[in-house]
Curated annotation (Swiss-Prot):
Residue ranges of every copy of the F-box domain listed in the record: 59-105
Species of provenance: Arabidopsis thaliana (Mouse-ear cress)
Protein name: F-box protein At2g26850
Gene3D superfamilies reported in the protein's UniProt record: 1.20.1280.50
One family name in Pfam for this protein: F-box
Cited InterPro entries: F-box-like_dom_sf (IPR036047), F-box_dom (IPR001810)
Amino acid sequence: MLLYLLITCLSFFFFSKSLSFPQWASKTKNLLSFYFSKYLFTNSLHQITPDLASPVLGKMSILDLPDLPLDCILELLPPSELCTMARVCSSLRERCVSDHLWEKHLKTKWGKILGPSAHKEWQCYLSSPYHLDSPHHKTSHLGLAKIISLMRSLSSIFRDDDHRRRYPSSIPLDSTMNFYLSLETGRFWFPAQVYNRENGHVGFMLSCYDAELSYDTDTNTFQARYPPHGKRAIAVEKDVTWERIRAAPVDASPHNLYVSDSLNELKPGDHIEIQWRRNKEFPYGWWYSVVGHMESCDGNLNHCQCHNSEMMVLEFNQYTVGSRWRKTMINRRDHREKGNEEDGFYGGIRKINCKEDIEMWKRLWPSSILE
């Protein structure tokens, strides 16, 4: 019996070494080896005589694993393989579509660019006629086959799906899996903000504008639709990269003045973003600026009283000295939209407290001073 057990374990060991496993499988190989070895050992203790023709090994599958190791394996699977695993049988399907597995993938890939407004828009999208299942609004579920057909572009693993067995199933519309796949396939346009819109056009350097975004998995970039400017058509930009996108830091409409709550605490050297629009028909964008010193101040921090002044200087140092865009004055006590049709209109202000946000603006700094 011991010889039989030794031969079996060694055969399994050398066979597993010869296989080429995906990255996630290498992390679970030891777990599976331990479980199967334990299974063989415990069964050998109960057998009086060896049964070389026993079909136990041939019938064993991943479903024979206890819940804990099985869940650990599923948590290591990438989204495309989770979808494939969900088609194996009904038992695995229930596990593979559960929210707790997909929430990790959603947060890892999409968390930094999905803000509260995106989640609100998703709920509206589910009940809109633009949803995938809108022609059949009587049902509240999407077929798994339809979802997987949308995921085929994610991985070549789906190219042979027609030769695999199909299981009827459904996924709740409000599930995290549905949310992830709708983002991944570009079916859902979500709200976010884009740095340096329109491919870094000189007129938008060091700005961030609201947009609706759709992901293109083939290029790993986004298509952006910007709010219309008055009677102008919606501006569309393609090939927007991940690093140019952020979730909106504040819940403010691009057409409304943001109510500032930090004006009294601002002092020279603070980094801020301020709303600005070309005219009343344009939406606001957020522009990077630094609080400067008053003309009457020599800049010596030991004697500076600028933070006590009713007026506040904002500097846009990406523009050359003497440019009309270089500086502007804001009344911190009675702040409201300020400007004219020639210089544009300045709106609400928010202080930047996050070092990562400040570093992002610095990385976007133009290579040459603007006029």
